[in-house]
């Protein structure tokens, strides 16, 4: 992302109060249209994978859940240029449900591609396997970083946020700034598995990324040389 990309989609932003990452979506969609893309698949994902089985729920935030509807109804070039815009509602938590939903979507929108249901189901299995392997790599890197911090008596910052905070345009260079102060940077998903929150909480723990945040805060409590900074884009 970039400021220039953001500006490309400014005219279709429906509300000034939506978060900056939400506004950035307009620029990305306009960029795809300008490149001549004729089909855009932008599902509305209601639930994430439930990483913490003790949480109250595992919703995505309302913007993530419904923003494809905003795009569909507020980006005029989608209709002007006859773009096939596909935004089915689905959940990522139930693998079998996801397989069934994708089979429905592909049979309806992509019948001409002749993709079999078995191919779709195998693809979901492979994707989930890779997702879990990726998350395991992140956790392993977090454990190694914590070990190094403790062994060498360094200072560290858990930079907690949402996945879009990996985007330099969204995080505004905060990871690099913290590194320049001779402090290690860890993401909340690299260490949150090392702690458990004490329940009940005084809040409804229903958002997946907040669930990580609470566990990350619990983790930081145990260390004098590790602090937590929360990134927020609202």
Model regions: which residues?
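An N-terminal assembly and electron-transfer interface module characteristic of large anaerobic redox
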Residues: 1-234
């Amino acid at each position: 992302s970039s400021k220039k990309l953001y500006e490309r989609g400014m005219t279709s932003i429906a509300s000034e109060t939506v978060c900056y990452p939400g506004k950035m979506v307009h620029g990305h969609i306009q960029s795809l249209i300008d490149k001549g893309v004729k089909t855009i698949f932008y599902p509305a994902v209601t639930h994430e994978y439930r990483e913490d089985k003790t949480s109250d729920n595992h919703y995505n935030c309302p913007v993530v859940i419904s923003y494809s509807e905003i795009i569909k109804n507020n980006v005029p070039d989608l209709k002007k240029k006859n773009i096939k815009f596909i935004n089915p509602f689905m959940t990522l938590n139930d693998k079998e449900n996801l397989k069934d939903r994708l089979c429905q979507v592909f049979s309806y929108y992509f019948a001409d591609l002749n993709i079999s249901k078995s191919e779709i189901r195998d693809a979901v299995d492979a994707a989930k396997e890779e997702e879990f392997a990726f998350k395991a790599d992140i956790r392993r890197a977090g454990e190694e970083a914590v070990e190094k911090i403790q062994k060498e008596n360094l200072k560290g910052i858990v930079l907690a946020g949402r996945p879009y905070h990996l985007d330099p345009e969204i995080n505004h260079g905060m990871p690099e700034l913290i590194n320049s102060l001779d402090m290690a940077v860890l993401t909340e998903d690299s260490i949150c598995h090392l702690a458990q929150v004490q329940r009940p909480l005084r809040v409804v723990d229903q958002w997946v990324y907040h669930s990580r945040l609470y566990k990350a805060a619990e983790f930081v409590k145990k260390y004098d040389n590790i602090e937590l900074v929360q990134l927020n884009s609202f």
